[in-house]
Amino acid sequence: MPAIRLQHASVPMTTGGNDQGRHFYGATLGLTEIPPPAVLGGDGFVWFAIGESGDEIHLYTDESGPNSPGQHLCIQVDDPAAVREQLEANGYETSDTDVIPNRPRFFTHDPFGNRVEISAILGPYS
């Protein structure tokens, strides 16, 4: 029974970081905020939909922060250069990394220190 796709990534944020998360993932990256299930209580959670695919990012309150330098989530976009420009215009630093064929990409960090890869998929890896 193979996996079908990654449905969501859960990303830690600091207590009281809801507005910062909304600015980074919502206002800056253009994701649509969706309500988390009421059973979770609400205040320590901010969820976002990515397009119409059903993919989601779930921000949750956790003071331990990001765990390792390689931990990250990747958001696929059509135009990484335009997204990079938007991030930098909003004060977020970006950095290049190893080139992967057909995957123009760069990295940034959300307001909570989580590493975020922004990438386009132009074809197969090789």
Predicted region positions:
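Vicinal oxygen chelate
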Residues: 1-4, 88-126
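N-terminal beta-strand motif that seeds the catalytic metal site of vicinal oxygen chelate
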Residues: 1-22, 71-73, 124-126
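Short glycine-enriched loop/turn motifs at secondary-structure junctions
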Residues: 4-5, 65-70, 100
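Core segments of cupin and vicinal oxygen chelate
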Residues: 11-54
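Short acidic/glycine-enriched loop/turn segments that link adjacent beta-strands
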Residues: 40-44, 67, 100-104
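Short, charged/polar surface micro-motifs in flexible loops or helix N-caps
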Residues: 52-56, 64-66, 80-81
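Conserved beta-strand in the GNAT
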Residues: 57-60, 117-119
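Mid-chain, well-packed structural core segment of small domains
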Residues: 69-87
